[in-house]
Amino acid sequence: MTAIPHQRITSLKGQRQALQQRARTIRAATGTPYSSEVHLLLGQSYLDPASWQELTASGGVRAAVRRAQFVRRYRHLLARLEAAIERYEQHSVAQNSPGAERMP
């Protein structure tokens, strides 16, 4: 069964929020600032509430095409963000593990 368009958009919004929370949790636990890649991708994936609302509420053929294009691009962007967060987490944990050299 295929999700209706606004459910796909809502799902992507939730996925982005979960990724952002994961990055925040890593930063809080390790004290390591976001990598430039994570910071950039969080910025690129941000949409203001009005934009999310417009994507889910609009109707018609043009809106359907716009949503389909958005979903395709946004999934790719979120996959890149997830990979960047995984690298950030690995780097942060390695940097803050016992025995790791600390910079003054």
Question: Can you describe what each PLM-predicted range is?
Answer:
Residues 9-12, 16-19, 23, 44, ...:
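Heptad-repeat amphipathic alpha-helical coiled-coil interaction surface used
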Residues 6-8, 18, 31, 61, ...:
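Short, positively charged, Ser/Thr-rich terminal linear motifs in low-complexity/disordered regions
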Residues 1-37:
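Short, charge/polar-rich alpha-helical segments
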